[in-house]
Every structure is written in structure tokens, then in C-alpha cells.
Curated annotation (Swiss-Prot):
Protein name: Cryptide Pep-4
Superkingdom: Eukaryota
Task of the protein: Presents weak lactate dehydrogenase (LDH) release from mast cells. Does not induce hemolytic activity, mast cell degranulation, and antimicrobial effects. In vivo, injection into mice causes moderate edema formation, but induces very weak or no change in nociceptive sensibility. It also causes an alteration in rearing (standing on hind limbs), but does not impact locomotion.
GO process annotations (BP): killing of cells of another organism
Compartments where found: Secreted
Keywords, in A-Z order: Amidation, Cytolysis, Secreted
Modified residues (Arginine amide): 11
Expression by tissue: Expressed by the venom gland.
Cellular component GO terms, alphabetical: extracellular region
Other remarks on this protein: The primary structure of this cryptide Pep-4 is identical to that of cryptide Pep-4 from Tityus serrulatus (AC P85840).
Length: 11
């Protein structure tokens, strides 16, 4: 989740 930050926020 936070570790990625890509798929979630897309930023």
C-alpha cells in the first residue's frame, strides 16, 4: 500500500 504508492495514488 503505502510502500507502493503508485497503484493507489497513481502519483
Amino acid at each position: 500500500n503505502i510502500a507502493l504508492g503508485q497503484d493507489q495514488s497513481g502519483r
